[in-house]
Amino acid sequence: GNGHVKTFWSVGQHCICCAREAAARGLSNRMVLASLLHDASECYMSDVPTPFKNELPEYQEQEAYLLHLIYEKFLGSDLTAQEQAQLEEIDHAMLWYDLDGLLEKQDGEPPKLHIELDYTVESFAKVEAEYIRIFEKYSRSEK
């Protein structure tokens, strides 16, 4: 949304919802953690809107490399093709709802979700605490 949305919604909140959705789908602890971390590169490189990012191939390369390092550090390896497909399915479903709820009604049939979404504005401290709680829970079980 980058300022165009009805209310603030952080990348952290989006990632928390992705992790919760992965858990609700019964995916592995590794996939829950990957879902939480999938936008972690944006902490360092910023959240660039997709239409603009698509025009920045060098940016995409650097972002992919940074995400590779993050996955190596916290998951032990990059995602497999199957894991990447699962993550993209969750991320795209969540983005559909993010756009529908925060920007404008989306066309077509909504993707199936296994969690209830709540776009309540939360304090940074509360979001950070929940992100860390999920990270610690699933990174402990990943070792």
List PLM regions with ranges:
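Metal-dependent phosphohydrolase cores
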Residues: G1-K143
